[in-house]
């Protein structure tokens, strides 16, 4: 039988007992072995991070295959693997695995591209997802996970920016125990690399690539050069089970879209600062902003580092572009935008009122009290002059500000220049992206 192009998408298999959709995808790759050629790298697709009922990282996976078998038989085989995987590790409460098998090139479908964009920045319901699949002619099975699986089919099309994540998985006997990753070695490899992203928190010297939960991930290293990423196995002091190289939309900022702020949306809007920043206990900064129609509270969190420090320097009248997630109303009755990135477009002129200079000696005079005039501290001259207005030099400069490296959310941009893929499909061997230790 001639090879046909198929896309397999999976979501919602995460479990508090150790399940993980990317881990399951790696097991499926091992099962497929040389029976299928890949038409792309395995895809790790992050969706809207602001959905409260999402899985931990709100990620689905997609395998684009050149397959010579029956799509329905593949569907049944994969569903059996999913059932076998999730039976001893039930999905998180309210979750239900989803599987989609789609023929052809779903990244060329206008409807599926629309679905992907919506799932990145808004809420998608199951009926919208299944209607899109039905119109395209895809097969699907499962529950809520079908939403993420369907929404990921058109991700990472030619021309879109992308990054890589090389994920190392733990041996089952090590699940739940403390991970062993040499932070010093990670720091050394970071220093030797030109295309790594968000793997190390420099201030604390910790490895952000290593998670802390009971899931089977040992560490996931991100960057733009697969060759550099494979070197990070030198930083592991725990023998991994296997590793998978994913192409991903992580750190592309693709979810931050220009649209009206509504609860749970991801937005990218131009606003004007309306009031001086309010610094809260703990270091968080709240700034009241307006888009000309509505006002919002822009929240800059302490762990964002340079982003929060820049927010402290904002001043009424500054024009900024803020990108982030919309949260429910704040105590002040406004929608809150949790800021992931900010671009300062225009810095307002800041003026202060100061006492006049002494007309005799030129020293700055001192106020004698409300309505009592001024006195020169140098020569003693008294005067009933008026305050002067002076322009104060602003410390804040126009430009882009991002989260501190090591603390950026999965999709948040980090200011790096990212590659794009010219065409699809391509031909990749499973052995190029899967390594068993």
Swiss-Prot record:
It is an enzyme of class 6 (ligase). The keyword Magnesium does not apply. The keyword Nucleotide-binding applies. One of its GO terms (cellular component) is cytoplasm. Its EC number is 6.3.4.22. GO terms for molecular function: ATP binding; ligase activity, forming carbon-nitrogen bonds. It is found in: Cytoplasm. It catalyses: cytidine(34) in tRNA(Ile2) + agmatine + ATP + H2O = 2-agmatinylcytidine(34) in tRNA(Ile2) + AMP + 2 phosphate + 2 H(+). InterPro entries: TiaS-like_TCKD, TiaS_FLD, tRNA_Ile2__agm2C_synt, Zn_ribbon_TiaS. Belongs to the TiaS family. This is tRNA(Ile2) 2-agmatinylcytidine synthetase TiaS. The lineage of its organism: Archaea, Thermoproteota, Thermoprotei, Acidilobales, Acidilobaceae.
């Amino acid at each position: 039988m001639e090879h046909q192009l198929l896309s397999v998408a999976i979501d919602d298999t995460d479990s508090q007992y150790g399940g993980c959709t990317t881990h399951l995808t790696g097991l499926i790759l091992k099962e497929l072995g040389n029976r299928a050629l890949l038409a792309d790298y395995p895809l790790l697709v992050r969706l809207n991070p602001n959905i409260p009922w999402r899985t931990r990282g709100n990620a689905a996976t997609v395998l684009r295959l050149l397959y010579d078998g029956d799509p329905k038989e593949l569907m049944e085989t994969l569903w059996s693997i999913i059932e076998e995987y999730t039976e001893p590790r039930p999905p998180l409460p309210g979750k239900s695995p989803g599987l989609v098998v789609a023929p052809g090139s779903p990244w060329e479908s206008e409807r599926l591209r629309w679905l992907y964009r919506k799932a990145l920045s808004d809420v998608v319901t199951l009926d919208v997802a299944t209607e899109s699949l039905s119109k395209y002619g895809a097969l699907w099975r499962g529950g809520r996970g079908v939403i993420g699986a369907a929404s990921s089919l058109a991700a990472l099309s030619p021309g879109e920016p992308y990054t890589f994540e090389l994920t190392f998985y733990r041996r089952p006997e090590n699940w739940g125990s403390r991970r062993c990753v040499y932070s010093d070695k990670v720091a050394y490899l970071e220093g030797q690399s030109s295309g790594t992203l968000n793997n190390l928190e420099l201030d604390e010297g910790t490895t952000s690539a290593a998670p802390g939960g009971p899931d089977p991930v040992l560490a996931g290293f991100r960057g733009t050069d697969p060759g550099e990423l494979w070197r990070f196995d030198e930083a592991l002091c725990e023998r991994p089970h296997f590793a998978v190289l994913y192409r991903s939309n992580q750190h592309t900022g693709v979810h931050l879209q220009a649209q009206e702020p509504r609860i749970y949306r991801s937005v990218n809007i131009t606003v004007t600062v309306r009031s001086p920043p309010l610094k809260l206990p703990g270091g968080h900064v709240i700034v009241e902003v307006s888009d000309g129609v509505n006002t919002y509270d822009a929240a800059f969190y302490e762990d964002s580092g340079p982003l929060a420090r820049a927010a402290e320097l904002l001043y009424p009248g500054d024009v900024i572009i803020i990108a982030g997630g919309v949260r429910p109303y704040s105590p002040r009755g406004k929608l809150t935008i949790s800021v992931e990135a900010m671009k300062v477009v225009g810095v307002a002129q800041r003026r202060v009122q100061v006492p006049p200079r002494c007309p005799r000696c030129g020293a700055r005079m001192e106020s004698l009290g409300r309505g009592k005039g001024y006195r020169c501290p140098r020569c003693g001259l008294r005067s009933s002059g008026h305050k002067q207005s002076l322009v104060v030099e602003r410390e804040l400069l126009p430009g882009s500000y991002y989260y501190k490296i090591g603390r950026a959310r999965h999709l948040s941009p980090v200011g790096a220049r990212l590659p794009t893929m010219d065409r699809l499909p391509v031909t990749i061997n499973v052995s190029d992206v899967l390594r068993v230790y």
